[in-house]
UniProtKB/Swiss-Prot annotation:
Lineage: Eukaryota, Metazoa, Ecdysozoa, Arthropoda, Hexapoda
Origin species: Drosophila melanogaster (Fruit fly)
Compartments in which it is found: Nucleus; Cytoplasm
Alphabetized SMART domains for the sequence: JmjC
Region (Disordered): 64-88
Gene3D superfamilies: Cupin (2.60.120.650)
Top-rank taxon, per record: Eukaryota
Alphabetized PROSITE patterns for the sequence: JMJC
Principal subcellular localisation of the protein: nucleus
Entry protein name: Lysine-specific demethylase 3
Family under the similarity heading: Belongs to the JHDM2-like histone demethylase family.
Gene name tied to this protein: Kdm3
Disruption outcome: Viable but adults do not produce viable offspring. Adults show high incidence of an arrhythmic circadian rhythm phenotype with increased period length. Adults also show reduced levels of starvation-induced hyperactivity. Adults have increased sensitivity to ethanol-induced sedation and decreased tolerance buildup following repeated ethanol exposure. RNAi-mediated knockdown in germ cells of adult females severely impairs the hatching rate of offspring; this phenotype is partially reversed in the presence of RNAi-mediated knockdown of egg/eggless.
């Protein structure tokens, strides 16, 4: 395996804990010197090597361990002058301080001969052993588990001692608290957010925050240590704390080992108490782990199991900021007339503040009028009043439905006979072959039903916005990418979890930058991996010129082992978060031309990922490129197999091409046939036959609510073929399936699931909601670029998928939680509450000043 491939297996460098996944492969070659090596990739459940999770050889005695560490001490870089001076001051003053060096460096600061060494965390102990054995170590200072966490002090003899851990209430500084607690005097992290945007975010994300708040409160009841101490782990800039068991981001409450720094999240503790995640009898024990897959303690005396009664309850949020924000959220939503259906007692409280209520009522009215005025010149007081009445009616029905324990969505009619028999609430009763079943989302917002909109209604809702409906009224297509009022129709459909297509995006882009010749010129000599879409094989380390030249010339395409041109796609390029660095000009061009910029830009006020403070590790939201040859001649082979994403995304077609060195008629005929077989409606087929429209890719996007039905079908087909279902794998997340016309027909016949068949042409942008299963088949050669975002409407799906991914095997590419959705929700709510609180204070102060002046 090449160094590049090995490096690609290492998890993000910003995580404090890292994962290295293994890949099983076999190599097929042929004698022709021009042949290409293809590596066959399998998604089998394989043992993994987690770099941070290695536990020392249990057969080593304690004396041998100490000897190894002493030998490695000579290889530790000496303290810098600044570090030495700082520790001299600590020694002379005898003051208590937070550990400011990694454990492996602390012995350098303790020159007393014979003194007991400070216990090392598992990261630093692993580093010492790796150094002793001559292996390179990539552990930086900040990866130390006790960095900025453990309290230290020099005693009277000059020996360094551990004196406990920080108190979350007495030790955070004002700067630490400001990160977490809403403060009307501190500007929010996000960009410009007006009153209506804040109310909109609170409407869609407020209940989810309340659910997280109550879930965090469970930690206190789960804590089993007789020591009631709660430690505070300070948030370290540029570091993402993750659970050592499930790789989910540690949001607040978790449990920590005082000896080695092992950390485990709330959900894993609940699983252990309930007996879940227990190793199956047929599976061999994983080295260094107990029967629940928990890492053994790396204590110098030897590996030991971590016991719940000995772990220390730890919180990350400083002070009482979580409770402060939770109470403030309910007060703000009550004052600002935002419907809340979380069901907790705070949602029913009445706030007796007549003056504030009157002022806020005026501010809401003004902001609605301002928003509608920007949407349409026909806005009026009557229109605003109608919207207020509709909001009030929906809030009343939401409360009524919550008390009865059923779902309510606008437009649904409840009767005594149908109450409790809704297809959404009974959708899972007949599913049998599900490993990841969403039996219920208690405390969360439920799925809204699909929306079929008439053109007459949409025109009345947003007059002047050019648009049409495809898929029999289920797919909105906006035909002017930069129309200022697009958001009205977009939100009406997007909140129901349906995809949207926006055309004419290419007008805002410099398409010369996105041409294959431009990429071949700029990056032709750079090596990268390719994938043969016909069989899924990897073609490693090829100059990208071989790929880009094949875009327009069939004779220049790389041959497979049988001499046939391969159907290639470029794998993971540009890599990771390096798009802006590798392609700065194209990055700037894309950011300038993104449709719905309030959602898709990194600083968009409805992209709530923008609310994450700068000190946090930003989630990798792209952009990403998808470059592949057309496969219309192979209708059962997808360019991108069925999968779903944890965040929302917009995918823009920036280039469509057909090789001109051969007969193009079979390709064109196959394209039209694929569109027809794909289930596209008459309007779509007519559009694709227009001479000035070049279809690029055929999408099938399914509703997120139907993901489990799709799982059930695919698992059933797997069993019918005589294969066994793997417990820690998932037919959608594994991306092994492309639903051809036969499977799609069976899905509709047996489950009633119908997707959105979408043909993406040059300049079209397809918006895919979080959690929506989708697949893509390139009809012609395509270059697509995608940007992810986190919208308030789909926050529930993001949250649920985080929990879904943690149950995948550790070797799965989707296993690790890189979105940190709880942190995003927390800081979005914090910013909205801050802005609304500040707005009413400023208004009251302004009116008071005016009265005094009069």
């Amino acid at each position: 395996m090449s160094q590049k491939e090995l490096a690609a297996l290492v998890a993000t460098r910003t995580s404090r804990k890292r994962t290295i996944s293994s890949t099983s492969f076999s190599i097929s070659t042929r004698t022709d010197p021009k042949s290409i090596i293809e590596i066959h990739i399998f998604n089998d459940s394989l043992p993994i090597k987690r770099a941070c999770c290695e536990v020392e050889n249990p057969t080593l005695k304690a004396e041998q361990r100490v000897q190894q560490e002493e030998e490695s001490l000579g290889q530790v870089p000496p303290l810098t002058e600044e570090e030495q001076q700082r520790h001299d001051e600590f020694r002379n003053s005898g003051s208590i301080f937070l550990q400011d060096l990694p454990c492996f460096k602390l012995q350098q600061a303790q020159p007393i001969a014979g003194s007991s060494p400070i216990p090392k965390c598992r990261e630093c102990r692993r580093r010492n052993l790796a150094t002793t054995e001559g292996e390179p170590s990539s552990v930086s200072d900040v990866y130390c588990r006790f960095y900025e966490f453990r309290r230290l002090q020099f005693n009277e003899n000059g020996e360094l001692c551990v004196v406990g851990f920080p108190n979350p209430y007495s030790e955070p500084s004002p700067e630490d608290i400001a990160i977490w607690q809403p403060d009307k005097n501190t500007p929010p992290t996000s960009g410009y957010m007006d009153i209506q945007v804040c109310r909109y975010i609170l409407l869609h994300a407020g209940d989810q925050f309340c659910y997280i708040w109550h879930q965090e409160a469970e930690a206190l009841s789960l804590h089993q240590n007789t020591d009631g101490t709660i430690a505070w782990k300070k948030a370290v800039k540029g570091t993402r704390e993750i659970c050592d068991v499930c790789d989910t981001t540690l949001f607040n409450y978790h449990w920590t080992c005082r000896k080695c720094g092992f950390g485990v999240c709330l959900d894993c503790v609940k699983d252990r108490k309930e007996g879940l995640r227990l190793r199956r009898a047929e599976n061999a024990a994983q080295k260094g782990c107990d029967e629940y897959h928990w890492l053994l303690c790396s204590d110098p005396s030897g590996p030991q199991e971590h016991v719940l009664t000995e772990l220390m309850l730890t919180q990350i949020i400083a002070g009482d900021a979580l409770n402060v924000l939770g109470r403030l959220l309910h007060e703000v939503r009550t004052l600002w007339q935002v419907p809340q259906v979380c069901g907790c007692l705070l949602s029913k409280q009445a706030i007796e503040d007549a003056q504030s209520k009157e002022v806020i009522q005026d501010m809401i009215k003004e902001s609605q009028l301002k928003q509608h005025t920007s949407y349409s010149s026909l806005a009026s007081e009557q229109k605003v009043h109608q919207q207020q009445r509709l909001d009030q009616l929906h809030a009343t029905k939401l409360e009524f439905a919550r008390e009865l324990g059923v779902d309510y969505v606008p437009g649904r009619v409840w009767t005594k006979e149908t109450l409790g028999k809704d297809p959404i609430t009974t959708a899972f009763d007949n599913l049998k072959h599900i490993n990841f079943l969403r039996k219920g989302l208690a405390g969360l917002r439920r799925f809204l039903p699909p929306r079929t909109m008439t053109f007459a209604y949409s025109t009345q809702l947003a007059p002047g916005v050019p648009h049409e409906f495809l898929c029999d009224g289920r797919l909105l297509r906006l035909t002017d990418a930069m129309h200022p009022d697009n958001r009205v129709l977009f939100q009406e459909v997007w909140k129901c979890g349906q995809p949207v297509m926006i055309s004419e995006v290419a007008r805002s882009l410099n398409l010369d930058l996105w041409h294959p010749q431009a990429f071949c010129r700029d990056f032709g000599d750079k090596p990268n991996d390719l994938i043969n879409c016909l069989n899924g094989n990897l073609v490693p380390n090829q100059p990208m010129r071989h790929f880009w030249e094949g875009f327009q010339c069939m004779t220049k395409r790389l041959p497979d082992a049988y001499g046939k041109p391969m159907l290639l796609k470029l794998k993971d390029w540009p890599p990771g978060d390096d798009f802006a660095e590798i392609l700065p000009t194209r990055f700037a061009d894309l950011m300038k031309g993104l449709p719905m910029p309030e959602y898709t830009l990194r600083t968009g006020n409805l992209n709530i990922a923008s609310c994450l403070p700068k000190m946090f590790v930003p989630p990798d939201l792209g952009p990403k490129m998808y470059n592949a040859y057309g496969s219309a001649l192979h209708p059962d082979k997808g360019t991108t197999n069925l999968h779903l994403d944890i965040s929302d995304a917009v995918n823009i077609m920036v280039y469509v091409g057909i090789p001109q060195d051969g007969d193009t008629r079979p390709q064109m005929a196959a394209t039209q046939k694929a569109i027809e077989i794909g289930g596209c409606d008459y309007i779509t087929r007519a559009r694709c036959q227009s001479p000035d429209v070049l279809p690029g890719a055929l999408w099938h996007i399914f509703p997120a609510r139907d993901a489990d039905k799709i799982r059930d079908l695919l698992n059933r087909v797997t069993l019918e073929k005589g294969f066994r279902l793997e417990p820690d794998h998932d037919p959608i997340h594994d991306q092994n399936w492309y639903l051809d016309d036969k499977l799609r027909a069976r899905l509709f016949k047996e489950y009633g699931v119908e997707g959105h068949p979408i043909v993406q042409c040059l300049g079209d942008a397809v918006f895919i909601p979080a959690g929506a299963p989708h697949q893509v088949q390139n009809l012609h050669n395509c270059i697509k670029v995608a940007e992810d975002f986190v919208s308030p409407e789909n926050i529930t799906h993001c949250y649920h998928l985080t929990h879904e991914f943690r149950r995948l095997s550790h070797s799965h590419t989707n296993h690790e939680d890189k979105l940190q959705i709880k942190n995003i929700i927390y800081h979005a709510i914090k910013d909205c509450c801050t802005i609304l609180t500040r707005a009413v204070d400023e208004r009251l102060n302004a009116e008071l000043t005016k009265l005094n002046a009069d």
